UniProtKB/Swiss-Prot annotation:
This is Chitin synthase 2. The lineage of its organism: Eukaryota, Fungi, Dikarya, Ascomycota, Pezizomycotina. It comes from Paracoccidioides brasiliensis. Keywords: Cell membrane, Cell wall biogenesis/degradation, Glycosyltransferase, Membrane, Transferase, Transmembrane, Transmembrane helix. The gene is CHS2. It is a multi-pass membrane protein. Polymerizes chitin, a structural polymer of the cell wall and septum, by transferring the sugar moiety of UDP-GlcNAc to the non-reducing end of the growing chitin polymer.
């Protein structure tokens, strides 16, 4: 007995020492193949096994038979824990693997297999999922007959005080492969009877000492290697079961619980919108969404709310990085809305007035990793959607959930601890790919009619709005009731550390975006008509978009383009609706008996990625150029619609001035090919004169002859390439053409600078004449060119945003011939390519399953059997989102065009080419290339470009002055309201605070009036300081080169 007691004490001390090895056995990710070693003859009792870790699901685990003492015990030597590999005994030590003990024949899944809480979150009181029995492992020995049942407790040894994943009394292992460890323990316990019998044989004694090279090895055969796709380790496959579900108004609507892991770290769980995801299978057209009785959460129950801001995010096949960049930017904007506690509209519950609608264009097209990101936020669950409901095909799958977490572009969770507020999300995944215009029809005609919002904001996936962008867009509508649409400032993404500027394409587009936001958009905003509100970041007043009683209006004209695709539409109308947002802008301004205007909001900034390869760049600009050209023609033809509006006389005059400016710009666009050739012909040809030749020996003449014929042949080659090739198929030829255009442009610039230097080096008698304004080279080249480039610099400095002039202007001017020739030729040669739909998308798929009707109000469908299956799907989505893998690109088949559109394309290209050719030949014959100072046409072209630049600069300056005056007047009104009489201040507070308090708008007197005045002054000064701080921050950001 004394010997047994000492053995038991020794066993206890060993087990205390070996707690960390036991913990390592459970948490190791990949256990190495284990070898079965015999047991030592001198084993102690098993009475001192470590106690079990507290279960994560109290009260739900099955009862296990208590431990039975045997004559053998586990004797584990003390060792250190390796974070990367299991422990291996040294050759100089004597070690024996001890007999594992058998357990009950029924084993259960551990509670941590599918519902491990998020690391670092308070979830110690959370109960786990119900557990299922595990199947017996398949081994090479027959089943063992256990004499008794033994329970093996697994303890978490060691000090966990410094472990970042210890929460309360529970240790959470981040991404621990629990399933592999549990299988190892079960396999060892299954072998215990065989090891007990082998223990008595003499050969099972294993001693490892220095002089012994051979070691006895007992290899376990696990069977042949598996073939095919294997399940992810640590994640079980969700099991589906058939259930009967009651229909709501004949339609399938499901309320699904969110995964337990997500539920465990939510700060708010007090409402069903936080704990359940709502799925609706929409079987009707978007125009009939409300007519058929479909409702959203904002229309029913405790979540019935008014929607002030409705955000639309359109998505095609973008990856999870682009999606999270946009979605996380929206979540930050919602946090800014909620931080404006003094606002009469917003506040800490301002998120209840904002709804974000994500529309995926085609279930087969959406990126699977983007779905994983949505699933990680709780918005999407796999296995819920169905293809057919009640014998009706499903057109869209609508998921609704109020998420409280966000994923940043690094795929890291951000929650309330980072200031993230709840966000009402509607995820509409269309069954078929029907293009972006149809997605907007779902947004405006289906969900917009159900919510009836005040302001609608349109975003593209990939656009990252700055934290205050959406607020400034909304504020433009709140301050002016005549504003029907607003455009934000789109800036080109320059990559990490501005490394994208080393790509000439990215740099040139950065310059183009900047100058458009400095010159073009402010000019059009002063007139009240912006030709295009960018779909990447724009906003509309929903009331202004509605049609009149006869069914005609902006939305009817906007969606007319979707009805025309695939029908007998002429080429002009089809190309015009390639830029349908331009048609929408025109219809808003020209709406009958209304006086709507469009506004540019420069403080609303969004960053978007721009094409960085030649094929992608050309394909994008093809649609932009064709749509812009034909939409401009449409607005100029129908300019008389302005007369039927309720605009003031001053506004109508300004709009007609803008129409004249657009007509001149359109004419220069049409003849841009000839004007480029003539400019090169006269400026570069001037160096062919032997008296001016900088190289001597007529080298300048030979260079000009080579470049001249090269330019002509290259233009002809562009037509050949554009008529029968796509940029993706002939990328090298398109790229080589752009390089040759750059060489021609650089020689032209060199020629212009050399002639100016020669003019300045003339004799003293000729200096006065050469530098005077008139018909001379100095006037034509220097004054006109510097007036254009100089205005670019002046306006950039005026807007405190000049860095693009130093980093991107050279690349832009070098690629300017490619903009004029390459892009314009390709666009006009592909006017026949107007198809938007995808052929074959009308096939009804059944890969998701169908909901078969069983009675008049119930259907039978397959769903995840219980909470454990929902959790497993969430675990798999989270694990896949955390890995870095690429989704294979889908091939896009070449669209077939009708013969009629091809014929019209031929006629149009022929007319355009012949008109430019006649102009180039006539002017080149009328004027010689050696007489630049007396060339009237060159003077007309250069001075026209300079005049248009001056006109844009005047309009942009007026826009800046109006903004400054508006801010001064706004600040003066706030100061006057805060420093006026008690009545004036009280009324102002009553309107600004949203009616908070019964004393709003009541005259105060005496000490109460002084107290109210002091308090009001403090609040207004605080608001003014906050607004000034944001303005200073934006201005300082513009002055930084790396912005």
């Amino acid at each position: 007995m004394a010997q047994e007691s000492s053995n038991m004490d020794q066993s206890k001390s060993d087990n205390v020492t070996d707690n960390k090895p036991n913990r390592s056995l459970i948490s190791m990710a990949r256990p190495s193949p284990q070898r079965c070693h015999p047991l030592d003859q001198q084993s102690a009792s098993t009475s001192s096994l470590p106690t079990s870790r507290p279960s994560s699901s109290p009260g739900q685990s099955p009862n296990i038979t208590p431990s039975i003492l045997t004559s053998d015990t586990l004797h584990l030597p003390a060792r250190s824990v390796s974070p990367t590999r299991p422990w291996t005994p040294s050759r100089g030590s004597e070690w024996s693997r001890h007999m594992p003990l058998s357990v009950s024949s029924v084993n259960y899944e551990p509670p941590e297999i599918n519902c491990s809480p998020r690391p670092g979150t308070p979830s110690s009181k959370y109960g786990g999922s119900p557990r299922r029995p595990l199947r017996q492992p398949v081994v090479c020995w027959p089943p063992a007959s256990s004499a008794g049942e033994t329970s093996i407790d697994i303890a978490d040894g060691g000090d966990d005080s410094e472990d970042p994943f210890v929460v309360g009394e529970r240790t959470v292992h981040q991404r621990s492969n629990t399933r592999s460890s549990i299988k190892l323990i079960q396999f060892t316990m299954q072998l215990s009877p065989q090891l007990l019998q082998m223990k008595r044989t003499p050969w099972v004694k294993l001693t490892l000492d220095d002089g012994e090279d051979d070691e006895s090895d007992f290899n376990v055969h696990y069977g042949p290697a598996p073939t095919g796709r294997q399940e992810r380790r640590g994640v079980r496959k969700a099991q589906m079961t058939k259930k009967e579900v009651r229909l709501m108004n004949g339609e399938l609507v499901l309320e699904c619980k969110i995964p337990r892991m997500l539920h465990s770290f939510l700060p708010r769980r007090d409402d069903r919108e936080f704990t359940h995801m709502r799925y609706t299978a929409v079987t009707c057209d978007p125009d009939d969404f409300t007519v058929k009785g479909f409702k959203l959460r904002q229309n029913i129950g405790s979540t019935m709310r008014e929607t002030e801001l409705f955000v639309c995010v359109t998505m095609y096949n973008e990856n999870e990085i682009d999606f999270t960049r946009t979605m996380h930017g929206i979540m930050r904007n919602i946090s800014h809305f909620c931080s404006r506690t003094k606002s009469r509209t917003w506040g800490k519950d301002g998120w209840q007035k904002i709804v974000v609608c994500i529309i995926a264009d085609g279930r087969q097209k959406v990126h699977p990793r983007t779905l994983n990101a949505l699933a990680a936020m709780g918005v999407y669950q796999d296995g819920i959607a169905k293809n057919v409901v009640n014998q009706k095909p499903v057109n869209a799958h609508v998921y609704e959930y109020t998420t409280q977490v966000s994923l940043d572009p690094d795929l890291k969770f951000k929650g309330a601890e980072k200031g993230i507020m709840p966000c009402q999300v509607i995820f509409c995944m269309k069954e078929r790919n029907e293009k972006k215009l149809n997605s907007h029809r779902w947004f405006f005609n289906a969900f917009g009619r159900a919510l009836n919002p005040n302001i609608c904001i349109l975003l593209d996936v990939g656009t990252k709005p700055e934290p205050t962008a959406l607020y400034h867009l909304w504020k433009a509508f709140d301050q002016d009731s005549n504003v029907a649409g607003a455009a934000g400032e789109i800036k080109a993404g320059k990559g990490k550390g501005c490394l994208g500027l080393f790509n000439p394409l990215v740099a040139s587009q950065n310059f183009e975006y900047k100058m458009s936001n400095i010159l073009d958009k402010p000019l059009e905003s002063v007139f009240g008509y912006i030709t295009v509100l960018p779909g990447a970041l724009s906003a509309y007043r929903y009331h202004a978009l509605q049609n009149d009683s006869t069914g005609h209006g902006p939305l009817s004209m906007y969606f007319k383009g979707e009805m025309l695709h695939g029908k007998n539409a002429d080429v002009f109308t089809a190309n015009m609706y390639l830029a349908e947002d331009r048609i929408l802008c025109w219809e808003l301004v020209a709406k009958r008996e209304e006086q709507w205007v469009l506004k540019f909001v420069k403080s609303a900034v969004g960053e978007t990625d721009v094409p960085d390869t030649v094929p992608e760049f050309i394909s994008q600009r093809r649609r932009w150029l064709n749509g812009a050209f034909f939409a401009a023609v449409y607005s100029l033809i129908h300019f008389r619609q302005i007369w039927r509006t309720d605009h003031t006389i001053t506004r109508k005059i300004l709009l007609h001035i803008e129409f004249l400016y657009q007509f001149v710009s359109l004419a220069f666009t049409f003849f841009s090919l000839a004007n480029f050739y003539l400019t090169f012909y006269f400026i570069a040809g001037a160096l062919s004169d032997p008296t001016v030749d900088p190289f001597g020996h007529n080298i300048g003449k030979y260079i000009f002859a080579i470049l001249r014929y090269t330019c002509v042949l290259l233009i002809c080659l562009q037509f050949v390439l554009s008529m029968g090739n796509r940029p993706q198929g002939a990328k090298k030829m398109f790229l080589s053409g752009m390089i040759i255009y750059c060489i021609i442009m650089m020689y032209t610039v060199f020629s212009a600078l050399y002639m100016v230097v020669m003019q300045l080096k003339t004799s003293k008698e000729m200096i006065k004449d050469s530098l005077s304004l008139g018909n001379n080279t100095f006037t034509y080249i220097i004054v006109s060119t510097l007036s254009t480039v100089g205005l670019y610099f002046f306006m950039s400095f005026l807007y405190l945003d000049p860095w693009h002039m130093f980093t991107s202007s050279i690349q832009y001017f070098a690629l300017l011939p490619s903009y004029i020739c390459r892009l314009q030729i390709y666009a006009f040669c592909n006017t026949h390519d107007v198809t938007w739909g995808t052929k074959g998308d009308n096939v009804i798929r059944t890969d998701l399953g169908t909901a078969r009707i069983t009675s008049s109000s119930t259907v039978e469908l397959e769903m995840p059997s219980e909470q454990l299956d929902i959790d497993s799907g969430y675990d798999e989505s989270s694990a896949i989102s955390a890995t870095d893998s690429k989704c294979p690109r889908q091939s896009h088949p070449r669209r077939r065009c009708r013969k009629t559109t091809t014929a019209v394309r031929t006629y149009m290209v022929s007319v355009w080419f012949i008109a430019n050719a006649i102009l180039a030949m006539a002017v080149s014959e009328a004027f010689t290339e050696k007489s630049v100072g007396n060339n009237a046409y060159l003077a007309f072209v250069l001075w026209s470009v300079a005049s248009l630049a001056v006109f844009r600069a005047v309009g942009s300056t007026a826009f800046a002055i109006l903004n400054v005056v508006h801010r001064v007047m706004e600040g003066k009104m706030k100061f006057a309201a805060a420093g006026g009489t008690g009545y004036g201040y009280g009324s102002y507070v009553g309107s600004s605070s949203g009616g908070g308090g019964g004393s709003s708008g009541v005259r105060s007197s005496g000490a109460g009036s002084s107290l109210g005045l002091s308090s009001g002054m403090g609040e207004k000064v605080s608001d003014w300081a906050s607004e000034t701080g944001w303005a200073v921050k934006r201005t300082a950001g513009k002055l930084r080169f790396w912005r």
